[in-house]
Amino acid sequence: MARHEFQTEVNQLLNLLIHSLYSNKDIFLREIVSNASDALDKLKYLTVSDDNYKNISFTPKIDISFDDKDNVLVVQDSGIGMNDEDLQNNLGTIARSGTKAFLEKLSSDAAKDSSLIGQFGVGFYSAFMAAKHIDVITKKAGSDGKIWHWSSDGTNSYDLEEIGADSDLTKKYGFDDSALTGSAIVMKLNDESKEYASRWKIEELIKRYSDHIAFPIYLHYDQNKYDDKGNVTSTEKKVDQVNSASALWKRPKSELKKEDYNEFYKTIGHDGEEPLHYVHTHAEGTQEYTTLFFVPQRAPYDMYQADYQSGVKLYVKRVFITDDDRELLPAYLRFVRGVIDSEDLPLNVSREILQQNRILETIKSASVKKLLGEFKKMGEAADSAKKAENPTDEDKAKIEKWNKFVANFNRPMKEGLYSDYANRDEIAEIVRFKSTDSSGTGDNNWTSFADYVQRMKTDQKAIYYISGNDEKNLRENPLLKAYIDKGFEVLIMADDIDDIVIPGFGKYKDFELKAVNRAGSDEELGVDKKEAEKKDKEFKPVVEKIKKALGDAVKDVVLSKRLSAESPSCIVVDENDPGFQMERMMKAMGQEGMGVKPILEVNGDHSLVNRIKQTDDEALIKDVSEVLLNQALLIAGVEIKEPAEFVKHLNNLLA
């Protein structure tokens, strides 16, 4: 028997599971049964799609047995099974790039963290919450027939060995039958978990969490017979099927309760929480298919990772095809969990065929429109509830539901504005933004484009926004005051993708979107042109002095027509240049920046600017110019290149 060390991250996870996360220990059985179902799905698919597997003997089922004297619980499936390489990859390591971040996210808050465990796809390890030792006996279908024994107590290492057809373990779990494949998970329960070696506890958990599993789950138990005095006279071996074994999504919606959907979601979503929303659709006609989609309460841990795991499973006539195809829904809907089941796709469809299949493309298109329609209705229901004079509990629930959606999924929905041209009008009704409007239409002044337009001034020609990396900084930007004073509402866009998405989106209905921190966005402020020309002429020497002092640090210096008296300067970006957010994103991705240079606007009514007007002292002009630029950069949330130099110039002015 060879001993192997667990990957460091597995050790950390097991330590958390065993010592910290006890809030909902019951989920371990749900996770083990779900894994067994996945193993059956995979083999079932191979038996209909791969000639090498079509003639194997395959009876899909899950068997659960227990020993209440030795406190042992066994879950065995007749699925795909594993070889030694699979065991090392699946049960010895966590091959995910986000492992470290996930473990950092886990905390001592057990109620919260239990849902994260399954999200990360480490359901097997959750068994160590109840078991002090686990043995896995397994044989892989279509392989060399070798039987493997994996064993661990969850501390630091595991043992792995090949066992013969004549070994006791092989015979005990039936793997001496050459036709039998699959895995047996043998859990020696710890002292605090003896209740799981009980017929009634197992049956209760299967009915609660796994009734919808599409394969039969059989519970093996001993039933005693008693005489009149209560003495055991005989014991009979019994086997009962304890789940309904029907694909929940294929059942009529009228037969299903909210609880049925919730428990199904917890299994396929590996989540301890109920879904935020679900939508169940049966489509008939040219194509026949069923979709059942769920929106989680919280964003999946890997939503912003390049190797995020797709949350949608594809079935054909209830035969599992794949759960690893990101083409089933567009990337901006990667937080959606659920099932697509087609009656028309071929069973032996390959990954390459899927990517070009018209049937699947039609299903995808209809599914996206259905989901977007549901999201829009959620938002409208919440907005309507917010306007109620005396909101009911139902109104409050609608508002809370929508606020959760916005808090978790507003950013990926914005990605859709940029990437999904066909549906951008629908997405534009869903996305929300912070705003300078004091009434707002949601908590913390979230608003929609539609509500912004309703509040616009009568002759207003554009939707105004300001973008940057920090909401607080943006709200304090001196540019805002000019627009607010003139009665213009400004959207606050502090997401790192806003500088990419919004210019690409461009217009909402007939209204152009204009960034107030870009040049050329001040035409509606009602500036007196004659007065502006007079002032430009008066301050032209001042502007030239500042340009000379700053050199290549700026693209241009102009006299501002919108700053209030207390603000000496601000920076804007040229209409045709990428924003500072784009620059920041590129550098964060290890790419060379585009060298965006700001345009410095200076306020001729401010005393600091007038100090330059009154002097030809080049040192003083340099000090004032550097302070005007760098304080404007700081207020805009842009990193200054030489902080020490800035402080030196500031001190010179204060001396």
Spans of model-derived segments:
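GHKL (Bergerat-fold) ATPase N-terminal catalytic module, capturing the glycine-rich phosphate-binding loop
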Residues: 1-191, 195-196, 457
